[in-house]
């Protein structure tokens, strides 16, 4: 079973500053509206969020929205408890499973990502400060298809 430990941040900028060099990371921007689920560690993202979201793009997003921090828009980072044993396929499967969990709530219009073409057949345990749409799958219940 794969275990993902979640940490909640006030916003994406705070998450970015703290974890920009972490590899094999799942992240969620937003919780109930305008939600994006992504990951780093695969597809050339071995450098973490700092490679995916180069500093100039983070700064430009502040200019676009006219704010240093998103209003009422938390961000979450999910790190793997045993990242040495986690493969690129594991990272992508966990990302897809989290996307499915959000879409199953019926909030498809709030998703800023495309629906995955398949639901991964893996078991994942979530612990820590999980996004609200994953709480029923946290600690002990796991998630599988």
Task: Give the positions of each predicted feature.
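Boundary/linker segments flanking structured domains
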Residues: 1-35, 41-145
């Amino acid at each position: 079973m794969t275990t993902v430990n979640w940490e909640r941040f006030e916003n994406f900028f705070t998450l970015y500053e703290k974890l920009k060099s972490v590899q094999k990371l799942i992240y969620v921007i937003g919780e109930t509206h305008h939600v994006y689920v992504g990951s780093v560690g695969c597809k050339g993202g071995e450098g973490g969020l700092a490679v995916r979201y180069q500093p100039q793009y983070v700064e430009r997003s502040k200019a676009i929205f006219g704010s240093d921090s998103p209003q009422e828009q938390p961000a979450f980072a999910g790190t793997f408890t045993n990242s040495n044993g986690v493969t690129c396929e594991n990272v992508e499967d966990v990302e897809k499973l989290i996307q499915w969990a959000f879409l199953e709530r019926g909030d498809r219009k709030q998703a800023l990502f495309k629906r995955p073409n398949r639901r991964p057949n893996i078991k994942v345990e979530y612990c820590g400060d999980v996004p609200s749409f994953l709480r029923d799958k946290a600690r002990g219940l796991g998630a599988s298809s």
